[in-house]
Amino acid sequence: LICYNTPFKDISKTCAEGENLCYYGKKDAVWNLYPIRGCAD
């Protein structure tokens, strides 16, 4: 599991097929870590 604590980190180069990643994003006006599956857009 790879988590980044910044919304500005480019994870597109580090993700792999089926890899579990986390991204720091704004949801409902709150910055937080959210789990995603696979590569980021």
From Swiss-Prot:
Q: Which InterPro entries match?
A: Snake_toxin-like_sf (IPR045860), Toxin_cobra-type (IPR054131)
Cite the record's tissue specificity text: Expressed by the venom gland.
Question: Which Pfam families does its entry note?
Answer: Toxin_cobra-type
Give the signal sequence positions.
Answer: none
Q: Where in the cell is it found?
A: Secreted
- Recorded GO CC terms: extracellular region
Listed disulfide bonds for this chain? C3-C22, C15-C39
Q: Which GO terms describe its molecular function?
A: toxin activity
* Keywords of the record: Disulfide bond, Secreted, Toxin
Which family does the UniProt entry place this protein in?
A: Belongs to the three-finger toxin family. Short-chain subfamily.
The entry's protein name is Maticotoxin A
